[in-house]
Amino acid sequence: MAFINIGFFSKTLGMEVTCDVILPQPVHPENAQDELPVLWLLHGAYGNYADWMRRTSIERYVANTGLCVVMPSAQNSDYTDMAHGGRFYTYISSELPERMRSFFPLSQRREDNYICGLSMGGAGAFKIGLSKPDHYAAIGCLSAGAQNKGGRLIRMMGSLIYGDTPCEGT
């Protein structure tokens, strides 16, 4: 298994971004797959790309599965194209998969792609997975809180992220 920390310039965000990648090492190289199945693993609020490697056993969990794991950073964006900030939904759902596939032999087939996240990342995985059902075979939401109702701080963060225009049906 290879563990790679990769940085590149995101055109969508207009800044340098970082993510961790776990690449499987084939037990029998002569039987290696041409394209790897991939898990897009999203961090929670106040976290970053390194949380999964530093605070979980993700590397042990995916050992011998042949699964690539991509763990990007999305700041505290709620995986949304912010009204007053970065376009993190577009970055995570479109640019990141394209860039990772240009670096590594990752499958584009729906049945080989999975998206999962914790807390804010779980809500982001749910949002991205449901908005792009033709891209993901499964969605994992771990402790996701998808509503933004609450106190003044929650309303202020919601306004900064989503803008002041209310959305119908929310």
Tell me what each language-model feature is:
Residues 1-170:
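Non-catalytic cap/lid and distal C-terminal segments of serine-dependent acyl enzymes
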